[in-house]
Amino acid sequence: MAGHSKWANIQHRKGKQDKLRSKMFSKLAKEITVAAKMGDPDPDKNPRLRLAVKAAKAVSMPKDVIERAIKKSQGGDAEDYSEIRYEGYGPNGIAIIVETMTDNVNRTASNVRSYFTKFGGNLGTTGSVSFMFDRVGEITYKPAAGDADTVMMAAIEAGADDVESDEDGHWIYCGDTSLNEVSEALEKVLGESEEAKLVWKPQNRTNVDLETAQKLMKLIDALEEDDDVQTVTANFDIPEDVAARLDA
């Protein structure tokens, strides 16, 4: 399987997540509300809600905002959201998966299509690119959790399938249906993880040049800034020297 994306680390260091923090809060709150509405409002009894709350805490979402999102799910006025996945190709044939949560499917489909068209890509049909990705659980630990061997042994014992470690941390991968089980087993050995979530993991990544990277970032930024879009995943990586020139 393809290694953890260096681009994701570079993106994080450049502060892109801070720029999108307010958007991120609203997207996470929506996921919490939907998860609580679909299951039990108690995170201990609702695996999806537990993961959503964990993701919110990972970006320091205030406790009262989390509780308000859960409470909203129990009200009669809670919106009905549809979860729709869009797939397509960005510049240079880079495969992109866009996960959305929307109360207006027509609006979202039109917006997503327009972003792909505007920034040199084209929207495909469901299944047109997802075969190039694996749906897996991803559990993230900071470097302080231990050295690579320690984390690898803990992951194997917990039932994980793969581990990737570098100076930025550890990424542990498992089957999509065993994420909660593996995450809980790891917590007993390594402590609480930084993040645990379901992801689309590219089977291979393509390194891109500066021009392609610039086009891709414009497309991904447009998608991520849309209130209906929850996640954007693509099978490319930006080498560090290209990333440095992106911000120059």
Curated annotation (Swiss-Prot):
One of its GO terms (molecular function) is DNA binding. GO terms for cellular component: cytosol. Keywords: Cytoplasm, DNA-binding, Transcription, Transcription regulation. SUPFAM superfamilies: YebC-like. Gene3D superfamilies: 1.10.10.200, 3.30.70.980. It is found in: Cytoplasm. One of its GO terms (biological process) is regulation of DNA-templated transcription. InterPro entries: Integrase-like_N, TACO1_YebC-like_2nd/3rd_dom, TACO1_YebC_N, Transcrip_reg_TACO1-like, Transcrip_reg_TACO1-like_dom3, YebC-like. Signal peptide: none annotated. It comes from the Bacteria. Residues 1-21 are annotated as: Disordered. Belongs to the TACO1 family. PANTHER family: TRANSCRIPTIONAL REGULATORY PROTEIN YEBC-RELATED (PTHR12532:SF6), TRANSLATIONAL ACTIVATOR OF CYTOCHROME C OXIDASE 1 (PTHR12532). NCBIfam families: PRK00110.1 (NF001030), PRK12378.1 (NF009044), YebC/PmpR family DNA-binding transcriptional regulator (TIGR01033). This is Probable transcriptional regulatory protein Rsph17025_0577.
